[in-house]
């Protein structure tokens, strides 16, 4: 029964603990949107390298 008050105090302190979002941003922090854009550009570049100039059906952007 001695542990019960300690357990209750710990439960009360958990919601008041600072969250991850409360930490100040550093110069190394990168927003997730830019990571998504970088991945999209990389995949698009790899897709373009796969396509040959004479195979227009494999490149949706090069259909003309």
From Swiss-Prot:
Q: What Gene Ontology terms describe what this protein does at the molecular function level?
A: toxin activity
Q: Which InterPro entries match?
A: T-conotoxin
* Cellular localization per UniProt: Secreted
Q: Which residues form the propeptide?
A: 23-48
UniProt tissue specificity: Expressed by the venom duct.
Residues making up the signal peptide according to the UniProt record: 1-22
Which superkingdom heads the taxonomic lineage of this protein's source? Eukaryota
- Where is it found, in Gene Ontology cellular component terms? extracellular region
Q: Which UniProt keywords apply?
A: Cleavage on pair of basic residues, Disulfide bond, Secreted, Signal, Toxin
Database matches in Pfam families: Chi-conotoxin (PF16981)
UniProt PTM comment: Contains 2 disulfide bonds that can be either 'C1-C3, C2-C4' or 'C1-C4, C2-C3', since these disulfide connectivities have been observed for conotoxins with cysteine framework V (for examples, see AC P0DQQ7 and AC P81755).
Q: What is recorded about the protein's domains?
A: The cysteine framework is V (CC-CC).
Q: Which family does it belong to?
A: Belongs to the conotoxin T superfamily.
This protein is called what?
Conotoxin Leo-T1
Source organism per UniProt = Conus leopardus (Leopard cone)
């Amino acid at each position: 029964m001695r542990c019960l008050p300690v357990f209750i105090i710990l439960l009360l302190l958990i919601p008041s603990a600072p969250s991850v979002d409360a930490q100040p941003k550093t110069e190394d922090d990168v927003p997730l949107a830019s990571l998504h854009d970088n991945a999209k550009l990389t995949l698009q570049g790899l897709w373009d390298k796969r396509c040959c100039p004479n195979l227009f059906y494999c490149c949706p952007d090069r259909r003309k």
